[in-house]
Amino acid sequence: MSEGSAIEVNGRRYAPPRAPVVVVCVDGCEPDYLDCAVEHGAMSWLGAARAAGTSLVGDCVMPSFTNPNNLSIVTGAPPSVHGISGNYFWDPQAGVEVMMNDPKYLRAETLLARLAAAGATVAVVTAKDKLRRLLGHGLKGICFSSEKADETTETEHGIADALRFVGRPLPSVYSANLSEFVFAAGVRLMETRRPDVMYLSTTDYVQHKHAPGTPAADAFYRMMDGYLARLDALGAIIVLTADHGMNAKTDAAGRPRVVYLQDFLDAWLGEGRARVILPITDPYVVHHGALGSFATIYLPADTRVDDVIERLARLPGMEAVLDRKEGCRRFELPEDRVGDVIVVSERATVVGTSVARHDLSGLDAPLRSHGGLSEQRVPVVLNRRTRVTPGARVRNFDAFDLALNRVV
């Protein structure tokens, strides 16, 4: 990529990288995780980086789930532009509920692909393979997941035998090791190939189980701090942000606080007449039992939307109940990929479909989850000083703009 040749992607201009840029999306990283870890002496590098560089708290996009936010970060745009409205949605053309992992659902090009096309060397490492195809869409470069690092080929992933390259065993998808593999791979890539731009995306296994400041959480962030320090020592401009925060979703006794919307609507409108979609749904339900703080509802044609909104808003634990138009305007969502009604529950409450459809037997700790406005605040930290307008709203998808355009 020639020096001075800026590129434009989704309405934003980006300068070419002046030094290796590493954007890290720490899944489920409520800002308190960093604050507690620094206070407890677990993140000495981050503490110094926040003091000498840039330390902000910004907003993620809604719903506060993995797919919409990772794609917002790599496109520099909200879901209304890139089209990824959740991890899961109702595809009206196919008439089925589907995982939103196929690049065919992506409506915008990624900055990563454009940078690579302009001649930059680009690498992507993600914890879960569900994100890999979306993040790597159109990308000429390295793109693989920790989850399937034993299956990589030069043709499909830009690197053969990533497991041997990183020098670590294949991690369990339900472990902190899945994220550590991402960091280890990032350091190894920077040491050996020194990409111009690298995107690292972890999993929130630890955050779903452990609150900020607990020993397990601090241990995770201590591990992360060590790898970030090594990337810094290698000369990288580092941006640390998150796809969403995380909160306890329990009552005073530690039991999940759930409002089952499908059961409620079936009892009122008739069984199966309304369809509740939970965009948190993904293949890894042990994390959260497919329970989050955001839902979208498709209603039968003869139903008055205003009546449904009014009754849902009276349910305990509701923060916002909006019609499609207002919800998509407020949350910057594509109207054709959400239902007639959008439901957001408050900080300590999640929404489900039916009691019978949620298996919570895999939860071995009090439920912690995300999806709502209460999980929208995320850290935005750089190891460089930046030009940021005081008081301006910062979004997690400003990460590449900050690293490429605003470093002093």
Label for each model-derived stretch:
Residues 31-33, 66, 82, 130-136, ...:
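Short catalytic/ligand-binding loop motif for oxyanion handling, primarily in non-cytosolic enzymes
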Residues 345-405:
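Low-complexity, glycine/alanine/valine/leucine- and proline-rich hydrophobic stretches
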Residues 17-19, 26, 64-65, 89-102, ...:
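Secreted, luminal/periplasmic, and some membrane-associated catalytic domains
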Residues 35-79, 123:
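Short, structured active-site-proximal loop/turn typified by the sulfatase FGly-forming signature C/S-X-P-X-R
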Residues 16-34, 49, 73, 115, ...:
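Beta-strand elements within well-structured catalytic alpha/beta cores of enzymes
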Residues 74-211, 217, 287-289, 293, ...:
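His/Asp/Glu-rich, glycine-adjacent segments
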Residues 39-41, 138-141, 213-216, 253-259, ...:
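Short secondary-structure boundary/capping segments
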Residues 1-54:
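Active-site-proximal N-terminal segment of extracellular/periplasmic enzymes that hydrolyze or transfer
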